[in-house]
UniProtKB/Swiss-Prot annotation:
EC number: 2.7.7.27
Superkingdom, natural source: Bacteria
Organism: Leifsonia xyli subsp. xyli (strain CTCB07)
Name listed for the protein in its UniProt record: Glucose-1-phosphate adenylyltransferase
Reactions accelerated catalytically: alpha-D-glucose 1-phosphate + ATP + H(+) = ADP-alpha-D-glucose + diphosphate
Pathway assignment: Glycan biosynthesis; glycogen biosynthesis
Keywords linked to the UniProt accession: ATP-binding, Carbohydrate metabolism, Glycogen biosynthesis, Glycogen metabolism, Nucleotide-binding, Nucleotidyltransferase, Transferase
Amino acid sequence: MGAGKKIFGIVLAGGEGKRLMPLTTDRAKPAVPFGGQYRLIDFALSNLINSQLRQIVVLTQYKSHSLDRHISQTWRPDGMLNSYIASVPAQQRLGKRWFSGSADAILQSINLLRDEKPDIVVVVGADHVYRMDFGQMIRSHLDSGSSVTVAAIRQPVSLADQFGVIEVDPASPERIAAFREKPSDPVALPESPGEVLASMGNYVFTADALIAAVRRDADRPDSNHDMGGDIIPDFVARGEAGVYDFTNNEVPGSTDRDRYYWRDVGTIDSFFEAHQDLISALPVFNLYNRQWPIFSQVLNSPPAKIVRDGRGALGTTIDSIVSLGSVISGAHLERSVLGPWATVDSGAKVIDSVVFERALIEPNAFVGRAILDKDVVVAAGASIGVDPDRDRARGFTVTESGITVVGKGVHVVP
């Protein structure tokens, strides 16, 4: 990785996640369940751990109870080796105020950097689905001599207003010439007019440069104190920002299908689509890569069970993920992800859907193109995802593409 260098990891996990409502009504965005048994933050932490980072803090703020609990119960490295993953809420060290942005979160936590005295700081978001070897990015950063290196991936021009967009220096393509946060008029890549180079929200900083940058930013009254909107453009203006091409990152166990996969799951539609990427026989993103595992809480649960019901009707699943503790009894599950301890009962059908923990789909109910949060009950004979107008009238969120979302603990009646 960085021979002789001390590396420190910071995960920015204080985001509110308004675009994922109602899934973020009672939890922080990084705590949203994903892929059956995971939380979104598990992907960032797994990548850091697999990259041999051993001192990591998670900066939390918004409705962080379930996130803090997940980190404390799940992520417990060996403390005897000075390894830790610690959840750090806003400490109000610089006054009686909460974090006012991602850069301010680092400023208010600067004591952590003073205590550990790292040479390099890896800063990542907590709400993307991907695999990445940060050791390779750190080596690229050290070789470049940049103060900050930004991981980048190509994205369609139509999505540019969702990302920080990078323009490189033609004479020195490893350097960032311009960085614009969520532009409405992006500059496309010269060699690929339909694409832009987007920031992945992953950064490698020289530690002293990061500390100086967040302090400078704190003195700017017009700043939003945001990493992408303020800190990175400051480095670009100083000629100190480099870019790391994600397609140069080779993760052990990757295949041609899922190599360089990266998903921002900040909207309901992208969250739903990312689940669809998991479930085919040859998935676009492979959860089963043993060489670069995605870690999560080890559930003390029985195996999933797919059985006939009392009348002998078969329980069937097609192209689906079924988590521990779940039971499909005389029901049909297709192109769906079923969370732990969920039940799909006789004659019920769940198609093209994402079902969270402890949901109950009663006999002859139907769920299609829907996301059901924890503890949802779909009563016998009830349906979700059939009539978008009726779903909206019942108070459910329905996206323009027709994905219905049912909030935590809701009882859906016929």
